[in-house]
């Protein structure tokens, strides 16, 4: 699998099949305008632009803006990022670990309640403010045992912490799933 195919796979996992299709079209071109991409992929232009912006925020694509001399509006030309994939994956790993660790800390250090009927979760303060009844269905709230969630988060942190995005590691194993 080459770098462009790997980026397309990542985009697909993050944003769905349309993102993968966009990346594959970009991989076979130097630059493509969002208008041409929308036509090629038969996508709604606003939907495509949102997807391109999501891919840009994830650092998977780049763009160039040029003024159309005839109408004075800007046209955007998109291409696959030239940033090394290992750097993108390392940064994403670091960000994801940070988020998972914050969620773990919240789960370990806070008491929560759950509605046995609809499954809505509440913090202690929210439960107290609602007199321990569910805002959605009126059922009496029960303490929530989050032991399973805590263990799952710890396992995900361990797996991701041990994952190495370097090319030699990727050849031998896939991204771990928690």
UniProtKB/Swiss-Prot annotation:
Q: What domain of life?
A: Archaea
GO MF entries: DNA binding
Q: What residues does the HTH TFE/IIEalpha-type domain cover?
A: 3-86
InterPro entries from the entry?
A: TF_E_archaea (IPR016481), TFE (IPR039997), TFIIE/TFIIEa_HTH (IPR017919), TFIIE_asu (IPR002853), TFIIEa/SarR/Rpc3_HTH_dom (IPR024550), WH-like_DNA-bd_sf (IPR036388), WH_DNA-bd_sf (IPR036390), Znf_TFIIB (IPR013137)
UniProt keywords, alphabetically: DNA-binding, Transcription, Transcription regulation
Record Pfam families: TFIIE_alpha (PF02002), Zn_Ribbon_TF (PF08271)
Its domain description in UniProt is: The winged helix domain is involved in binding to DNA in the preinitiation complex.
PANTHER family, per this entry? GENERAL TRANSCRIPTION FACTOR IIE SUBUNIT 1 (PTHR13097:SF7), TRANSCRIPTION INITIATION FACTOR IIE, ALPHA SUBUNIT (PTHR13097)
Protein family membership: Belongs to the TFE family.
Write out the function statement from the record.
Answer: Transcription factor that plays a role in the activation of archaeal genes transcribed by RNA polymerase. Facilitates transcription initiation by enhancing TATA-box recognition by TATA-box-binding protein (Tbp), and transcription factor B (Tfb) and RNA polymerase recruitment. Not absolutely required for transcription in vitro, but particularly important in cases where Tbp or Tfb function is not optimal. It dynamically alters the nucleic acid-binding properties of RNA polymerases by stabilizing the initiation complex and destabilizing elongation complexes.
The UniProt subunit note reads as follows: Monomer. Interaction with RNA polymerase subunits RpoF and RpoE is necessary for Tfe stimulatory transcription activity. Able to interact with Tbp and RNA polymerase in the absence of DNA promoter. Interacts both with the preinitiation and elongation complexes.
* Official protein name in the record: Transcription factor E
- The protein's organism comes out as Thermofilum pendens (strain DSM 2475 / Hrk 5)
């Amino acid at each position: 699998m080459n770098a462009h195919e790997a980026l397309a796979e990542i985009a697909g996992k993050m944003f769905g099949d349309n993102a993968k299709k966009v990346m594959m079209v970009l991989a076979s071109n130097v630059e493509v305008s969002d208008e041409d991409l929308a036509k090629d992929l038969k996508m709604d232009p606003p939907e495509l632009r949102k997807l391109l912006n999501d891919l840009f925020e994830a650092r998977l694509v780049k763009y160039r803006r040029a003024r159309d001399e005839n109408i004075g509006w800007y046209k955007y030309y998109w291409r696959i990022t030239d940033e090394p994939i290992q750097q993108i994956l390392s940064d994403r790993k670091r960000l994801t670990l940070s988020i998972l660790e914050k969620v773990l800390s919240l789960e370990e250090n806070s008491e929560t309640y759950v509605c046995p009927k609809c499954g809505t979760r509440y913090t202690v303060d929210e439960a107290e403010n609602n007199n321990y009844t569910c805002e959605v269905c009126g059922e009496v709230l029960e303490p929530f045992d989050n032991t399973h969630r805590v263990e799952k988060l710890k396992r995900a942190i361990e797996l991701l912490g041990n994952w190495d995005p370097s090319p030699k590691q990727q050849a031998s194993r896939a991204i771990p799933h928690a």
